[in-house]
């Protein structure tokens, strides 16, 4: 007798072993038809999986979150079958489900083309229509290596021989005549794959991610449970493309990058204004929350990086140089320099907490393939700060930091923030007692600020637990920016200490913290979040003043000058172009306000105001306009 317990608590007895599909059929024909997989005691399995002992079972349908990975994994297999049917001799390697889709890597001498993708997608449709049963088989390692070897599938032989652990059961999934090595699980048949997939792009990929190995051809695709979901995803991609910071940065003349300085940014005047506004704002927040700003050297001797542990653990990502028989490294992080400032004087417990902040310019030797506009660079600036405090001060310091962070994010237009608390890993420094106190302090600080959080057990760094803050932008994309990290290790390595109340020397707790993260990346996020429509306080040009004809040129100049004297970033267009052309051109620059002056405005000593989005605000006197603009800037709307 086998007893199966369902999610609603009901129990179904069976005389002997039973498959997931049979349980679904016993519940109802509708569920049997909708079943894509099962969860047996929490483990995702095929519908053909045999339950031979009492178990808990949930039937997985297209409505369940777990179904999406199954659908994407099956789409990858169907694509691989389509490729091998259309292009015999092509070798398949690996093809997993990934976020928003799937990919498969192929070994083929002739490169795939965009036209090939259309053919492959059409063949995938045909394979789905065939409704081929998908069956799981277990083969011996020797049998599998011989079969794939005879087929010329050298990559599969290597996977079986080197990647799959020797003691692991070797499963093969077969759909029609096509089969592949795979752990599964999979859908019951190709016909269960929703026709809501699309092949997206081609890329190169080294075998097993090693540049010493052969270059393979990767085909990316996306797959969803419903066509409506696919269409919504494609729409989001279109929106993301319109908002791409690389395109908008060029359109708005903010910055550029070039091959002579890979991963480094050339900031143009307009882009640098945005940078300066953000830096000035953060500097105000440093003062408001009791931080002291410092500056540390960009290049330090190898001995410093050896003491901090960076030379041993991070050297491949550091730019190094030598001079006068000494080795140096360009700093990849600011923390060792801040410890040196702390160590430069004797500190009492009364001096703590000590908060040191820096717009620290760092460089990391990121692989060229990982660089992406200003989102992933080699030279970047962090809004970095380190708090030196006593254990009993940690909770309050973290709580105050969270208040500061929430205010900053809200002012930049981000109100949806996800929080993760990562706790002790197996390998760590520090006592269990210290970790207990630290983790409790972080959790308490979050609760004090009314923040819910996802607990990530074992995901903390070896030197301390951390909180990560992730922003959700207008398109629903997630960007991890803020962090606060306890460090039990670096103060010890670099000899930081303070005089305690009992006159003994003690080691401070060090809190690493950032809100924006990399300034470059944060500006990239801002550009995409606002689609280049910077709020007034950040806009490089806040107001454009335009005359209709030469008669109003002097008045237009006087208006622009008055705005500048009032602290408004105003520009002037006195060109001979028609006013509609001027308005259209400056609208493409996404300016917050455009002021038009004609004869009527000049005579009445007013301006005609157009707000972004083609909003006609009518005529305003200059004093009223300046008051409005100043209020909007101060409110950071």
Swiss-Prot record:
- Short name of one Pfam family for this protein? tRNA_SAD
Q: Does the keyword Ligase apply?
A: yes
Molecular function (GO) terms for this protein are:
ATP binding; metal ion binding; threonine-tRNA ligase activity; tRNA binding
Matching SUPFAM superfamilies = Class II aaRS ABD-related, Class II aaRS and biotin synthetases, TGS-like, ThrRS/AlaRS common domain
* Alphabetical list of InterPro entries matching this protein: aa-tRNA-synt_IIb, aa-tRNA-synth_II, aa-tRNA-synth_II/BPL/LPL, Anticodon-bd, Anticodon-bd_dom_sf, Beta-grasp_dom_sf, TGS, TGS-like
Provide the catalytic activity annotation.
tRNA(Thr) + L-threonine + ATP = L-threonyl-tRNA(Thr) + AMP + diphosphate + H(+)
Residue positions binding Zn(2+): 335, 386, 512
Predominant cellular place of this UniProt entry's protein: cytoplasm
Q: Which UniProt keywords apply?
A: Aminoacyl-tRNA synthetase, ATP-binding, Cytoplasm, Ligase, Metal-binding, Nucleotide-binding, Protein biosynthesis, RNA-binding, tRNA-binding, Zinc
Domain TGS as annotated: residue spans: 1-61
What GO CC annotations are associated with the protein?
A: cytosol
What domain of life? Bacteria
What subcellular locations does the record give?
Cytoplasm
Q: Where is this region: Catalytic?
A: 244-535
Q: What is its EC number?
A: 6.1.1.3
Identify which cofactors the protein needs according to its UniProt entry: Zn(2+)
Q: Which GO terms describe its biological process?
A: threonyl-tRNA aminoacylation
Entry keyword annotation includes Cytoplasm: yes
Q: Which top EC class applies here?
A: ligase
Subunit (UniProt): Homodimer.
Q: Which family does it belong to?
A: Belongs to the class-II aminoacyl-tRNA synthetase family.
What protein is this chain from?
Threonine--tRNA ligase
